[in-house]
Amino acid sequence: DMGASVMMPIIFTLLGLIMGAKFGEALRAGMTFGVGFLGLNTIIGLMSATISPVATALVENLNFKLTAIDIGWATGSAIAWSTEAVPFVFIAVIITNILMILLGWTKTMDVDIWNYWHVLFSASAILLACGVNNVLAWVFAIGQAMVLMGITFIMADYSQADYAEVFGLEGISIPHCQTVSILLYTYPIDWLLNKIPGVKDIHWTSEGIAEKLGLLGEPIMMGFIIGGFLAALAHFTTHGVSIAAAIQQIFIVGMNVAAVLVLIPRMVSLLMEGLMPISEMTQAFLEKRFPGRELYIGLDSAVATGHTFVISLGLIAIPIVLILAVVLPWNVVLPLGDLATLPFFAVPCVVASKGNLFRGIIEMIVI
């Protein structure tokens, strides 16, 4: 009930103490991480509050004739954490992680327990389909959760070097089921793009764009332009909205998105300031007792949203996703609830493309 912003400092303080840190050092690191985590979630909340009305207006104005509505991850996670499967799957996943670490099958120590909701949801769906009184259904539900999280831990290890290179997340992996599942597509797509003559030579990096565009290539201006464009697209197509009101919304949304692109990297930096001492203590603890062993701290993909292209790509994808929803045959789902969280879908695209916006856009369209 206290939420991640309270529990994470407690977890990291205890972890620091276990690793041999003094109480003051462990508490400072845990509190700093908690403040950064709370700040990061606050800014992400600002982004969602800003973009959700814009996305809703776009959907309403385009008058889509789709029969099912995307209700978003928040509803899905709330459902997942409220079923009979929770205690059994939760314990099974923790045991799986511990066993895999002890056996040397993974280097990821997953402390991002809130995102267990993915496997909780799939386990609950199995029980709903087969019945909670079916013993085989329980075996399958728990078994699939353990296998899925096992694959997630392995993929988190595999992608860790890329997260360190692109986002500077040293000693951190992302055992996030959604992110890992998308990486299974973006890595092969990036490999294929690297084989196409001409395409493989296109590199749109944040540094290159900033150099070519000057002021317009800076995060604050990119945020204002992208946010303003989306607001214009939404409000100038709304019947009965005055030009003055539309222009007002363009500036409001533009400034809010600009603030998001500037503030998120700073919150991630504060989060990392608290995390790095714990990570270093963990590595020192392992080196002393298990020479040659390495351990990554598994966190939510939110810590990777500090890269300018993650937010930018997620926002650019909103109109693309809406167009695809209409033109793709047999699609009946109206994208809505998760439109504001598309930057989280952009994370594995930026990772696989090594921060190349051109490839990231292609990968985002495909997934």
Model features per residue range: what roles?
Residues 29, 36-87:
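Membrane helical hairpin/interfacial module
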Residues 302-314, 318-322:
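N-terminal signal-anchor transmembrane alpha-helix
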Residues 49, 73, 262, 266, ...:
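A short glycine-/small-residue-rich loop at the edge of a beta-strand within enzyme catalytic domains
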Residues 1-43, 84-296, 300, 304-308, ...:
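Signature of multi-pass transmembrane helix bundles
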